[in-house]
Regions:
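Acidic/aromatic-lined carbohydrate-recognition and catalytic surfaces
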Residues: 3-218, 222, 226
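Structured mid-domain segments that build the active-site/substrate or prosthetic-cofactor binding neighborhood
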Residues: 230
């Protein structure tokens, strides 16, 4: 085990405890190895000096610039290249995935581009002229996602993906800038469950106490890197 792998294992052990640390670390390293094999150029790039005071980063939704008959991401790429190509170095695209609420921040499918905006080819075209940042919404997921619908239907793969609270739990000390309840009742095949929903009833918090959630999110982030996220 090299120094980086040891550091990774130490972090995993701190979060999940010593007993499962070895297995979880191995699962993460397996995914990193597959990513390195599939993306050798990305895997060999240096993480140092990637951002400096000379960078100019533009943050935008994918549909801020539109032209009839053209995918908004395609229009955005052409507009930015023409008008800001010599000024902006990086484009931070706010969530551009299929979603159900909150202007994109309730993601239904992390690996798809919202068809109303375009497709992955349009994202790649934007990345040909600019470095890209993707907005990864990995604290919660849409209630319409495959994962949460699987939870409701009793799919064992997703029963620990979300945080379920026992009735009567005292949550009076939980403070957040939202007027909605912190837990939302959902009817499942196993009866009503109180599910943790920090932001809204449609945005279901992911349960990182379950290492499977961490592994899935790592897979998603590596996928984003393979699609041009810098």
């Amino acid at each position: 085990m090299n120094e980086l792998e040891k550091k990774l294992r130490d972090h995993v052990a701190f979060i999940y405890g010593e007993e499962p640390a070895e297995q979880i670390t191995t699962r993460i390293l397996e995914r990193l190895a597959r990513f390195q094999e599939a993306n050798p150029k990305l895997a060999s790039s240096s993480p140092e000096n990637r951002v400096s005071e000379h960078d100019f980063i533009l943050i935008t939704y994918g549909d801020m610039v539109q032209q009839e008959g053209q995918p908004p991401l395609q229009t955005l790429a052409a507009f930015l290249q023409k008008h800001l190509g010599d000024v902006v170095s990086t484009i931070h695209i706010l969530p551009f995935f299929p979603y159900s609420s909150d202007d994109g921040f309730s993601v239904i499918d992390y690996r798809a581009v919202n068809p109303a905006l375009g497709n992955w080819d349009n994202v790649a075209r934007l990345g040909a002229d600019f470095r890209l940042m993707f907005d990864a919404v990995v604290n919660h997921i849409s209630s319409q996602s495959v994962e949460f619908q699987g939870f409701l239907k009793g799919n064992p793969d997703f029963q620990e993906f979300f945080t379920v609270t026992e009735p009567g739990t005292d949550l009076s000390r939980v403070f957040r800038p939202r007027a909605t309840p912190v837990v939302t009742p959902y009817e499942t095949v196993n009866g009503e469950k109180l599910v943790w929903t920090t932001f809204s009833a449609d945005q279901i918090d992911l349960n990182y106490r379950n290492p499977d959630v961490l592994i899935e999110v790592i897979d998603i982030l590596l996928f984003y890197a393979s699609q041009g996220a810098d």
